């Protein structure tokens, strides 16, 4: 059973994706991961703590939920700050992050996110079939990127 969580800033889009993945055999969707704004959250209330950063809070919540695959909206990484992604990769290594992007996402931003631990990227408006394929592929240890993006990654590696 592959556990999946979706951290998308658009609740309607997130709900549609959750519903489409829930109907798939072998996938358990962890819902209500992100109920308010741009914060990743679980439906369980944490004890209030002082001096905790938003990133630490997210890491604690994801660590408690333990999704195998976490779809994260690229918009969460404002101004190229990938501290959340780096912390997820370091402290929750069992959780594999796939970025949700749109046409406005810059290739360099995606490559930076991949370099900081993301295991793939997918247009957030893609057909649900592609989300299912991404879950299966990333769960098996592979990456999920377009061939065009793979070419750009190879150019970076070789030059």
Q: What does each of the following model-derived ranges do?
A:
Residues 2-13, 17-21, 31-32, 39-42, ...:
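Conserved acidic segment of CheY-like receiver
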Residues 39-59, 65-88:
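Conserved phosphotransfer microenvironments
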Residues 63-65, 88-94, 116:
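Conserved phosphotransfer cores of two-component systems
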Residues 80, 106-109:
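Alpha4-beta5-alpha5 switch/output surface of CheY-like receiver
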Residues 94-105:
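A short, hydrophobic beta-strand element within the central beta-sheet of small alpha/beta folds
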Residues 109-115, 120-159:
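Short, flexible helix-to-coil linker/hinge segments that flank and couple to helix-turn-helix
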